Regions:
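Class I S-adenosyl-L-methionine
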Residues: 1-137
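C-terminal target-recognition/interaction regions appended to catalytic cores
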Residues: 107-208
Length: 208
């Protein structure tokens, strides 16, 4: 609707990888329908890209569609990967606060840690996956979702078995490659949802 109304010369569309496998009630691939509609007026290319290949300390994989209006007679070029090797991706330790800078409110309680351990054991016995994820500080972060405000278990910092914490708002901004002085509004929940729903700024910069 936006493209039909504004008719921009070009656009960049970002979405989760899951959209590639999403189907309608009648069994059609949603992405095929989208691409058919976009291709009426735009020359389009579609890619699956990692934000960590574009100077973002986060393994955030996304579908990127780039389109240029057909009357301009330009075919979009493939995005150029900035970080050529997995070994050169930015590790999350580069943007984390020092331990002494983190407020105690970010640390999990003894009860919460015990709950994680119990759930981990039950999941292991069932042969199922386990929800809580501990960051490997030498690698990019896991994807930060909008739901991170609920418990923060998608990406936890583990110093020891008894010292485990959630990421701070500042660290979440950095993981999405936003500058420290970037202003967020609303409650803590609102701010985390804004971060989780955003396109990582360095990712967008290189694509644009």
């Amino acid at each position: 609707k936006y493209l039909d109304y504004f008719k921009p010369k070009a656009f960049i569309m970002e979405n989760v990888i899951g959209m590639l496998s999403k189907k309608t009630e009648s069994g059609e691939n949603v992405i095929d329908i989208i691409m058919e509609q976009l291709s009426r007026n735009y020359n389009c290319i579609i890619n699956k890209l990692y934000a960590s290949d574009f100077e973002v300390p986060q393994n955030r994989r996304r579908v990127i569609i780039v389109g240029i209006r057909k009357d301009l007679n330009i075919i979009p070029s493939e995005p150029e990967i900035v970080i050529k090797s997995k070994e050169d991706r930015m590790p999350v330790k580069n943007i984390l606060l020092n331990k002494e800078e983190v407020d105690n409110s970010h640390y999990l309680s003894e009860k919460a840690i015990q709950g994680i351990n119990n759930k981990k054991q039950r999941s292991k016995e069932r042969g199922a996956g386990f929800g809580a994820q501990f960051l490997n500080l030498d690698k990019p972060s896991y994807t930060i979702p909008a739901r991170y405000w609920k418990d923060g278990y998608d990406a936890l910092v583990k110093y020891s078995d008894t010292e485990i914490r959630r990421l701070s708002i500042l660290e979440l901004k950095r993981i999405q490659s936003f500058p420290d002085d970037f202003i967020l509004v609303g409650s803590k929940k609102d701010m985390i949802m804004q971060i989780g729903n955003a396109v990582a700024s360095r990712f967008a910069y290189h694509l644009g």
